[in-house]
């Protein structure tokens, strides 16, 4: 049965009551004593540190200026619920945070609020127990797998810093309905899932504005970055390995189908299926505009160095592009590197694309003979 931590006993209130009372009798129930020992509340700082006692109710979490989660074991089927925090709250992860196994959709962690800071202390890890879920099917069948970290409705000047995610069952960060959010120094290590992990997107962005992701180090089995909608999105200084590259889309078929003012720069994509990718949905409506890829280095790419296409249907290309999601004002500047001999250097399939700036030097693979609808100055 799926539980939400906010429905459990409020140990914070219980801890405050006990601190004002005489010392507990030696015969006190061990579970209660352990729980009380796990909660320390001083001057608005709330610490949860007993591995056997996951983050409790926190019905009183709104009174915590700082929440420290130290070596906590979150029960199976449970969301570590850090939503609705008071403005300016600082959340710190210490030690290893673990999550029990259960087939469910998640998320494992959810955070929301205004001017929220989430920090991973030195040596801390959030371990998603992915090996128990990976079956080669991802979200397309098999076991039901929980998504990892919802960064939804984070507003103001919120940030997530130096957090290390290990072994995510599927998608890692879902960034949705957020504004002014910065993620820096994030490490995502799903390398243990290289044979059976699937749909382990690192950063999925939707319906968000003014988002910056800097210094990410990602090893996964799907998109390193996937921007499905949003404006003012920056990804810089990232290293992506093992996945599907730096992607816009697929765009179309959702409630929000506009991507604009995106900068993806100073990043490396290696040992991945694709390097740079923009894809829109067949027959859908929306727009992609003002997207810049700058100073992108590719190596060990196995499918496409650069792929931009307007023909996606049910997650797969059809070879027949449609014009309902025009791709305009795209700049590829100093996108360079190598692909494998069986891969394709560049593939562009457009029905409505215009106003592109093209500075691409990708070598080592095949030259596509199926490119179509190329904007002026673009070469396959």
UniProtKB/Swiss-Prot annotation:
Active-site residue list: 222 (proton donor), 244
InterPro entries on file: Glyco_hydro_28, Glycosyl_hydrlase_28, PbH1, Pectin_lyas_fold, Pectin_lyase_fold/virulence
GO MF terms, alphabetically ordered: polygalacturonase activity
Superkingdom, taxonomy of origin: Eukaryota
GO biological process: cell wall organization; pectin catabolic process
Location in or out of the cell: Secreted
Pfam families: Glyco_hydro_28 (PF00295)
EC number(s) stated in the UniProt entry for this protein: 3.2.1.15
Name used for this protein in its record: Endo-polygalacturonase
Gene name, Swiss-Prot/TrEMBL: PG1
